[in-house]
Amino acid sequence: MNIELARFNMIEQQIRTWDVLNQDVLNLLEVVKREDFVPTAYKSLAFFDTEIPLPCGENMLMPKMEARILQEVAVQKHENVLEIGTGSGYMAALLCHKARHVTSIEIEPELKAMADRNLSGYGITNVTTYLGDGARGWAGTSSAEGDNGSYDVIVISGSLPVLPDAFLKKLKLGGRIFAIIGDAPAMSGQIISRMSDTAYSTVNLFETNVKPLRNAIRPSHFSF
């Protein structure tokens, strides 16, 4: 397989056609090579329009979704990012090239170890990974966080039936959350922006169907 041709085709045929037109994002996909974050058994699928299996029953998102997320959160060099669901470390690596610092949470020890190896192999130092459950929010703090342990951008890599308030409280004024909200088969990729101390705006980006985060909060369906 001609890897560079496959990468070019992925960008031109999958990613551009999914409204990812930001040239900085497209250039970054050539710098951070996706195949380096794909398990060895699935490297031949690195550029396919599909989710790639990871250890522990998890998956990498489709390439077009990773790129669209990166474009829509529009991370700036001075910003701190919280990622829920480190996986293989690929999204963290992309975010690190844009951000001041990335804090990434992974519930599976095997995946955290995999991501740490991959990120270290790229010489990425502006990332801290933690072993923990971030599905209902992240109470941990790090020296990279802003005032009150808040973040400029939060990226949640699995789906949630509802967005816990804990994430909204972690968001700085002007900050953005990317989350996939809903239940299969009707899920929506959303950007939630903090407009003031009490006001948030939500933009629906696309419809999708992604595996939910383990231990995600489920709303009660009881009625009175």
Language model feature labels by segment:
Residues 74-199:
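Conserved nucleotide-cofactor-binding alpha/beta core module
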Residues 224:
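Catalytic, metal-anchored helix/loop core of enzyme active sites in primary metabolism
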Residues 1-82, 90-93, 98, 111-125, ...:
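Class I SAM-dependent transferase core
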Residues 220:
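Adenosine-phosphate binding glycine-rich loop
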